[in-house]
Amino acid sequence: MITLKNVSKWYGHFQVLTDCSTEVKKGEVVVVCGPSGSGKSTLIKTVNGLEPVQQGEITVDGIVVNDKKTDLAKLRSRVGMVFQHFELFPHLSIIENLTLAQVKVLKRDKAPAREKALKLLERVGLSAHANKFPAQLSGGQQQRVAIARALCMDPIAMLFDEPTSALDPEMINEVLDVMVELANEGMTMMVVTHEMGFARKVANRVIFMDEGKIVEDSPKDAFFDDPKSDRAKDFLAKILH
């Protein structure tokens, strides 16, 4: 479903990704973790072309992402992305946030787009807030709206870039619960997160990054119970204290 082969990226002379290779199979949940500045967010943003790469190849469902001929807008309509800071349109109501891309990109009629939006708002527990604006919702509610908005596009995979790191602690679980439900339903997911409880619960594999390299890429039990690298052992000791 998602394949990265020998992916490298530079910002000027600074190399942010070095020879990164991995694969996410259909229905797999892969958690990407590592210290700040390790390249996690950059890696996940290369998957749908938000971050261009200078070397290597990225394919999603057979489409080569970094081929100049690839229609990235079309690809992004099929790969949902949820960001750290929600990225909702502040001037649109919640229901409008959920219907806009369905109508503009997927060319859905307004009535079925609205029906789909309401169904997904109900799924994330927010149907009562359809006519409110983002600023009227808590951070946790806004992030659940962002997940529902991505799901409105019927994505083949979902990418999450630190979806809980901007939230107050008491709001984190309401977002993670939605993500756990998605994982249990078989959604293909790549998740950049420090939430190791979530990783233990639903990840098939864990990728550990440091200094732009994939240091470990292993089944979750192997990663948590028997990490191979000293860097991963050190990271887990700090984060699981």
UniProtKB/Swiss-Prot annotation:
Residue ranges of domain ABC transporter in the record: 2-236
One of the GO BP terms on file: L-aspartate import across plasma membrane
Compartments, record wording: Cell inner membrane
Subunit structure: The complex is composed of two ATP-binding proteins (GltL), two transmembrane proteins (GltJ and GltK) and a solute-binding protein (GltI).
Source species taxonomy: Bacteria, Pseudomonadati, Pseudomonadota, Gammaproteobacteria, Enterobacterales
Entry similarity comment: Belongs to the ABC transporter superfamily.
Gene that encodes the chain: gltL
Record InterPro entries: AAA+_ATPase (IPR003593), ABC_ATPase_HisP-typ (IPR030679), ABC_transporter-like_ATP-bd (IPR003439), ABC_transporter-like_CS (IPR017871), MetN_ABC_transporter-like (IPR050086), P-loop_NTPase (IPR027417)
One Pfam family in the UniProt entry: ABC_tran
Protein name from the UniProt record: Glutamate/aspartate import ATP-binding protein GltL
Enzyme Commission number(s) of this protein: 7.4.2.1
Catalytic reactions on record: a polar amino acid(out) + ATP + H2O = a polar amino acid(in) + ADP + phosphate + H(+); L-glutamate(out) + ATP + H2O = L-glutamate(in) + ADP + phosphate + H(+); L-aspartate(out) + ATP + H2O = L-aspartate(in) + ADP + phosphate + H(+)
CC terms in the record's Gene Ontology section: ATP-binding cassette (ABC) transporter complex, substrate-binding subunit-containing; membrane
GO molecular function, one term: ATP hydrolysis activity
Main localization, broad class: membrane
Annotated transmembrane regions: none
Positions with a binding annotation for ATP: 34-41
Gene3D superfamilies in alphabetical order: P-loop containing nucleotide triphosphate hydrolases
Membrane topology recorded in Swiss-Prot or TrEMBL: Peripheral membrane protein
Superkingdom per UniProt: Bacteria
Keywords: Amino-acid transport, ATP-binding, Cell inner membrane, Cell membrane, Membrane, Nucleotide-binding, Translocase, Transport
Purpose of the protein: Part of the ABC transporter complex GltIJKL involved in glutamate and aspartate uptake. Probably responsible for energy coupling to the transport system.
